[in-house]
Amino acid sequence: MKRFMDEDFLLNNQTAKVLYEKYAKDMPIIDFHCHLNPKEIYENKKFRNITEVWLGGDHYKWRLMRANGIEEKYITGSADDYEKFLAWAKTIPMAIGNPIYHWTHLELKRYFGIDEILNEKSAPIIWEKANKVLEELGARDIILKSNVEVICTTDDPVDTLEYHLKLKDDKNFNVKVYPTFRPDKGVNIERETFIPWVEKLGEVYGKKIESYDEFLDALKSRAEFFHSVGCRASDHAIDNMVFAEASFDEVANIFKKALAGEKLTEIEVAKYKTYTLRFLGKVYSSLGWAMQLHINALRNNNTRMFNILGPDTGYDSINDGHIALALVKFLDSLEKENSLPKTILYSLNPKDNYVLATIMGSFQDGSIPGKMQLGAAWWFNDSKDGNLQQMKDLANLGLLSRFVGMVTDSRSFLSYARHEYFRRLLCKLIGEWVENGEYPYDLEALSRIVQGVCYYNAKEYFGF
């Protein structure tokens, strides 16, 4: 029997061990999509205890605690930090087969030097040991300990990017922290957040926005500002992919209706979103950015809890909407104008992997290797099986060797352990192919593939 999570964890063959130890393990990390707070990075935020750094904002863990029958008081409620930690320690032994079980113990090992298994019995000593380490370990220290080279946060176009600018000028921190342009509030015209957001956009643009023309000019201006601060990618939450052709004048009238507080029809919303996303796609192409589309999430399912806790608190799920036709029309509309940017496609529904991977193949070109990317296993798919399946699907239909690799997509500074988890799975998979006689044992070629997926592909793709 193998030891629990030893140095060969997940590396079930000799080739995998060689590839991981010699070529994957020590590669720097480019985390091109995450939700870390740049203010906390700049200030080297210190955490009062392991509960704050581990459980604060981590809806992955919250979902497991709820599934284990833990009262909300001990998850997001009024219980003290130690009580919340004990509730997590009570839950994690039940998580057999769940990636969070592995991530939890990788994080304990890598950041706190703790090899004990977390459970109710070990919780008091782990609490003491981890909190002792955290006295000297701030946000920057965790990042440096993780061998991170680039971090791309997720930012609203109305953000001032104050802390990105401060980090850019900070000579004592050599990790690059860049913004990512996420204009969802300006795309989702049907939501009540739209009008207040347009007002905020006007404030940072320096001019009250009263027309669609001015709105588009302001979006472009903000994209150019983001570019000057190092932004090289956008990100869009496309929960339902739509496509509906419309003229500029038609969409301008829809925009005016929305600003006047009038209710829009479903087709009007689709026309507005289509025109606005196409405009943004052209802007991204002109700037040389990558456009990330996160598709098929079903958010805020539990109305009662949404009203209490708000979004991003663990009440989302996979959607099963049809995406192929609208997505193809959208990409093709940009391609026809020679304005299709580099694009990374993620779907929360794993059934869409083959759909996305074959759509990608229709829009690859000679401008850059892997211009169209199948994004890493996202959110509910970020597991042992989910990562392996995503890589197998990509390999079956495209070039795994050109994959830009893993992202944390996380709000936790400790989540860089997931890059190790991913790299071990990558080496396991490639090692199995080699040992099954499906690819030659050519370390020159294999090392190039492994190091490309772990680091070089993303570095070249984004131009970091």
UniProtKB/Swiss-Prot annotation:
Keywords: Isomerase. Its EC number is 5.3.1.12. The keyword Isomerase applies. The keyword Repressor does not apply. One of its GO terms (biological process) is D-glucuronate catabolic process. It is an enzyme of class 5 (isomerase). It catalyses: D-glucuronate = D-fructuronate; aldehydo-D-galacturonate = keto-D-tagaturonate. Pfam families: UxaC. Pathway: Carbohydrate metabolism; pentose and glucuronate interconversion. Belongs to the metallo-dependent hydrolases superfamily. Uronate isomerase family. HAMAP family: UxaC. NCBIfam families: PRK02925.1. This is Uronate isomerase. The gene is uxaC.
